[in-house]
Amino acid sequence: MPAYSTVRVGKKYSPSFKVYVTQDGKIVSPFHDIPLYMSGNREIVSVVNEIPRFENGKFEINKEEAFNPIKQDIKKGWPRFVKNVFPMKGYLWNYGALPQTWENPHEVDRHTGARGDNDPLDVIEIGRKRKEVGEVYQAKVLGSIALVDEGECDWKVVVIDVNDEKAKEINDIEDVRKVYEGLLEQTIFWFKNYKVPDGKPKNNFALDGKYMDKKFTVGIIKSAYENWCGMINSKSDTNICKENSTLMDKVDSPAIIQEDLSDEEVPECVHQFEFIK
C-alpha cells in the first residue's frame, strides 16, 4: 500500500479544524484518490479513519471542499459532539469510510427500500489499536448492518485491520461474536440510541436488524464502488467536490502547512453519561 500521511490545520474541536490526507507530500482526496481495492482480493479494502475509538467529536470527510479534508461536523454553528450513551464512551470503534464508494441518494437500495445518504460507505473497525483522524489502512471485510437514519439507507461495514493481532481469528461476522462477545449487540444499541440525548427519535434498522455476512457485504461494497464510478464521471451531483490528484481532470494539489495548535476546549457533555430507557 502507498504511504499516506496527514496535514493538520487549525485547532481540533473548532470550526477551522481540517485534516488533509497526503501521499508523497502531495495533498490527495480521501474520497476519490485512495484506491478502494489495492489488490484483486475484494475482501480486503482501504479504509480512511475519521473518528478514533472513544472520541466524541463527529469528524467526517467533507464532500464539498476541494480535496475533501476531514472536518468536524457543524450543527447550528457549533462543532458537533456525540453524547456518551451509558456505559459507552464516545464511539465504540474506529469509525471511518471506504474511499471510492458512494451511497446514491437518487436510487432506492434494493435490500432496504431506502435511498442512499449521499456519503461514502461507513466503516466500524473493531481492532485493538486506536487509529488517528485521517489514518489510512487495509482491512478485512467481516459483515455489515443496514441502519436507516432519518429515512436514508446508511450501511455500516464491519472490518478489522489486516495487521491487527486478532485478524487471523476473525474472518466473518460470526467470528466477531466468538472473539468479542457482546460487541455486536452493543453496536446495535449505540446506533439505535446515540441521537436520543439530542432530542431525536431512535434510529431503525432494515433487514430486521440482522448482521449480514462477508459475502453479502462484499456485494454491497461493489455496488457502492460502481455508484462512485458513475458519480465521478458524471457532471451532475455538483454538491460533491471531485477535485483530485490521481484521476481525470487533474488539478494542482494545494500547498498546506501543518499547524501544531492546542486543542479547543470541549463541552461538558463529553465528560458525562446519558442514560437511555
UniProtKB/Swiss-Prot annotation:
GO terms for biological process: phosphate-containing compound metabolic process. Keywords: Cytoplasm, Hydrolase, Magnesium, Metal-binding, Stress response. Mg(2+) 1 binds at D117, D122, D154. It is an enzyme of class 3 (hydrolase). It is found in: Cytoplasm. It comes from the Eukaryota. It catalyses: diphosphate + H2O = 2 phosphate + H(+). One of its GO terms (cellular component) is cytoplasm. Mg(2+) 2 binds at D122. One of its GO terms (molecular function) is magnesium ion binding. Diphosphate binds at R80. Its EC number is 3.6.1.1. PANTHER family: INORGANIC PYROPHOSPHATASE (PTHR10286). Belongs to the PPase family. Involved in osmoadaptation. This is Inorganic pyrophosphatase. It comes from Encephalitozoon cuniculi (strain GB-M1). The lineage of its organism: Eukaryota, Fungi, Fungi incertae sedis, Microsporidia, Unikaryonidae.
